[in-house]
Amino acid sequence: MQTPPQPLSSTSPNLILITTISLIILLISILYYHSIKTTIPLPPKKSYYSSLIKNYTILSWESSYEKAKKFLEPLPLKYKISLLYGTDNMLESSQKNIGCVGKLDPFFHKESNTIFNGMCLNDGPTGVRFSNGTSISWNSPLNTACTFDKKLVYKIGKIQGMEFYEKGINTILSPNLNIMRSPLSGRAWEGFGDDPYLISIMGTLFVKGIQDSGVIANAKHYVGNDQETYRRCSNSIIDERNLWENYLRPFIHVIKYGDVGSVMTSYNAVNGIYLSKNRKLVLEYLKEKIGFKGFVVTDWWAIYDSNPDYINSGVDMNMPGGKAYGKKYTGRDRSYWSYLDNYVRNRKVKEKRIDDAALRIIATMYKFNQMDNFNSVNFSRNTNNDENIKFQRKVAADSNVLLKNEDNILPINDKIVKKIAILGSDAFERDCPNERDFNCYTPKNPHYKGHSPIGYGSGTTTFKYLITPYEGILKRAKKSNIKVVSHNKLTEKGEEDIKTSIQISKDSDIILIFAHSISGEEYIRSEGSCGDRFSLTLLHNIDSLIIELSKINKNIVVIINSPGPVNLPWKDKVKGIIYSGYPGSESGNGIADILFGDVNPSGHLPFVWSKREDYCCDIIKTKCNETEKFRKKYRYNGSPNMEEYKYSEGLFIGQRWFDLKRIKPIFNFGYGLSYTKFTFKNLNAEMKESGLFVNVTVINEGNVDGSSVVLIFLTFPNYVSNFPIRVFKGFEKVFVKKGESVICHIFIDDFSLSYYSVEVNDFVRPKKGEFVVFAGSSAGIEDLKLSVKVKADF
């Protein structure tokens, strides 16, 4: 199958002709595949992904495996086993607030003069965890997805990879490929949204960036770990078609196109069997059918007992060592993996399974040139340099999504606006014992007070600094001689102080209200919740503040920091709304750049936004203390008494559900405004053996330069039954100067044109009928569409 060639944007017909001819020559020379066979082939040497700039040589799997075999050949069994389990239960790391979250110890085999330098694994998706502020605290992956900028996503991965490389970290535990099945999902901010195709593309670009820096990426959490409540004792019930079409597709993509080096099994069970001992999903599907060649590592403490089924089912590495918090967990217990030699002697585990696991781990390290001359672990190496900080600010700005701009209230015009009010505790410094630690929630400190630049859990980092919205706006307002007033105190009930806020801001020319919601992993308590959100309501009763202020001043802009959709009962009462997500350490500068027009907003929503009851799926949610009591008695980790999550919605997640049920959301998938006006026209599409080639003309009819995102949706041929009405299958971001136009080229490859057939137990490309192609700036725009016939000989 062919991966997309690098997109071009141009107004020159000659360049288009030359480009088209070049593409045809390239495509003819490459062998294409039309379905996933027993082992998915490696991607073509020339592809969109391989055309990205890199400065690191990556070996082929064949060469890596040969080197690994020679390395392992003289080693006794106990040395091979030592490669399969961690030696740090993370207590040391967390207490010091610095260090690897998982590691393999180095060793020296004297008889063969064999040296192994060890392996360091570390979180995560927003930068180097436990780095004590010596590296960038990045935006959330959900913000990354908001940019819809392929080159930007790759560069984020590349710079993050370089930071990990400098510190001697072999494996970065990212990206998270789970789907925002429910907007309440606690770790939704760690992923790339609610659409499998978008997650596939974003994940692959991120993986390529990381691994082009010489660091192993880790695709997680395999699979169906789409909620936090009872995650260690839950059962995701997913039918075969849905499993392959939605939940395995992103993993297939990062393996096929990203060549990802490692995959992490999740805590939950799928169809009754916990993932770390699910032979069907790990060994048969991931390794054999999909053709994954790297190593499989458990999520931390996802080994629940001493059953040899875990390693026999295909798991290669147990992290951080020992079994998990089962009924008799004893802290540093490593009994299971460290005594694998007993299982081999008792013939419960075959020695060739040990050999295979060790081979996969060492081969992956050889592939990324980590076996010789790799940096020693040193978390104090500073990568928080000016260049990286400047880029993080750009990402923070580019990931803001403008949702409403009535009367062009934005950008702030300093000829009109002389006084700004900044309200809402989310705009100001945080109230935590350690202001740089975003996992500061305890029973004594259960409320989140202050700005939310990131969620909580293993995905966060220790911030060296944080530019709050108040700081960023105040600094920028001074340049325009605009007065700033503010109020950030909460009442004793933990609510916004409405009376004082009104008094301070009533005569302001514009009121900026910062509102937030917070979520994360289940092991941390915040606002009475353990991970998943209770509701989509914003914190601290800020809805009441917004409504009351709107009665006396209509010039209100609400900026939302949240892990996804929130309720907007005041939507029609304010003039401006911005979704800012979790933008990282440069949050305040990024939002100031947008508010004052220094950056034209170009972000788009990577999820559909509506009321809780409108979505396909919900999450069983109880108070945190009630969940803990129930779990201790009935649903301990790895318990056979599982909480069931039935994925009965089938293929209809995200925008697809709203299309099926004809529900009009508050904001469609892909929605996002700009300070200029874009128009799309001249949709053309041509079906070829390699895939579908689409062209769209993008015109900037406004007075400001800007970037536009073209989204492509497809309706599959009618005979593909019980399939979504439209599926998202392509996008590109193009920069267009004011008064000019460009032609946006989008390629949809063979795999993306395929659907999973339960009849043939494989992905199949339609051989008859026609596709309907839709082009627009969001799922709600259907102005441009055309039909393309399928050719049977493809």
Indicate residue ranges for each PLM-predicted region:
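Short, low-complexity, Lys/Arg-enriched N-terminal segments of secretory-pathway carbohydrate enzymes
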Residues: 1-11
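Glycoside hydrolase catalytic-domain context in secreted enzymes
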Residues: 14-17, 22-781, 793-794
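Edge beta-strands of extracellular beta-sandwich domains
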Residues: 784-788
